[in-house]
Amino acid sequence: MASHIRGNLTEEQLKRIEANRKRALERLQQKKKKDAGEHVPSSTPKSTSTTTTKETGSYSPTKTLSQIVNSDSVQVSSKFVEIETDGSVKKRRVLTEEQRQKIEQNRLRAIEIQKNLKQRENQKDDSTTSSKPVDNIRLNQNRPDSVVSSTKKFQPPPIRKQDYIEFDFATMKDTKGGFLQDEKTNTQGADEQTLQDWKNKQRELQKIRELPPPIDLQNIPRCRECQSMEVDANLMTNFNVRACRKCIKALPEKYSLLTKTECKEDYLLTEPELQDTTLLPRIEKPNPHGYSRMQLFVRFQVEEFAWKKWGGPEELDKEWERREENKVKRKEKKYHDQLREMRKRTRAEEYTRKLRDGKSLGERHVHDWSSPVNIDKHTIKRRCIDCGIETEEVVI
């Protein structure tokens, strides 16, 4: 009865109160040290921590992780975690063999890069010191390192002054001041030219070539029209046509030049006939409208060959009209074929639509009229819901 009276405590209760007081005091000290930034070791007393068993109600002492680690009798080690002296647990990183090899390779590569950078810096220092005058080297030795490092980047290269300049005229080339270029010379010899290059060169020479002066005045070539001795060299050399320049300008319907396209379209000549130079001589010039070379023919030679082929200008006109009619017929036939195909597709689509709607192919359409709409006083308008046809009815 005396133990339950206020103010009278047992020894066991006094011990518990004293232990709680000490524990609170230690917590307060740890908090102050933590706020001050000092390291706080684990200070849980071994003797003060007690547990009570349910069966007997007695108290048994317990130990924390730091007490177990600090104890001499227990050895704690793990492959995956590290336990510090203060009882904190850190996860240990486990590296594979491949990761270790990669780390070692990166370390060796970094060492090699550092060595190369040092060698380059040493070479730069050697080159700069060798190019500097002796007086500058002596003066720079007395200057502080900070000044030398700051002015090193902006120091201009040394100027080597000499009394004369040496030139090797054997290796010197005239560049024309950079404004003029030498004419392109053919580095290939005559034997190394292709056959097509040789033919093109010969054609160019034929265009420029002029007729030699006459030796025999009686047998000199004269113009076919006016018997003049001033024969055009181009027509005489390339087409074997004797005509002076005055007659060429006066008679363009006879001596003008025609292109290959005009010969095909106007005179209905074929490609093999135009390619045969024995039948129709020609000259070639650069085409201003494309990359292929332009072929030119004399008009009266083309007309003579066309009259011989078709039998005269009237027969040529008939052949041209016949080809134009055939061209129109082919165009109309193509149009009708396309129209027939379109009708077939439309009919097939109509059959497909009827089958999809569940109607037979031979079924007659019956209009499903909508309600009438009044247009004016005596006229109404109706519309089929299925096909969309509209009718107007007059109401009398």
Curated annotation (Swiss-Prot):
SUPFAM superfamilies membership: Putative DNA-binding domain
GO cellular component: nucleotide-excision repair factor 1 complex
Pfam families in the cross-refs: XPA_C (PF05181), XPA_N (PF01286)
Ranges of biased composition (kind: Low complexity): 41-62
Biological process (GO), any one: UV-damage excision repair
Alphabetized InterPro entries for the sequence: DNA-bd_dom_put_sf, XPA/RAD14, XPA_C, XPA_sf, Znf_XPA_CS
CDD domains: DBD_Rad14 (cd21077)
Keywords carried by this UniProt record: DNA damage, DNA repair, DNA-binding, Metal-binding, Nucleus, Zinc, Zinc-finger
Annotated Polar residues bias: 63-78, 128-153
Sites where the protein binds Zn(2+): C223, C226, C244, C247
Key word Metal-binding present: yes
One annotated GO molecular function: zinc ion binding
Bias-annotated ranges (Basic and acidic residues): 20-29, 118-127
Zinc finger unnamed: from-to: 223-247
Cellular compartments annotated: Nucleus
Region (Disordered): 20-101, 116-156
Entry similarity comment: Belongs to the XPA family.
Function as written in the Swiss-Prot or TrEMBL entry: Involved in DNA excision repair.
UniProt protein name: DNA repair protein RAD14
Native species: Candida albicans (strain SC5314 / ATCC MYA-2876) (Yeast)
Lineage: Eukaryota, Fungi, Dikarya, Ascomycota, Saccharomycotina
Gene transcribed to yield this protein: RAD14
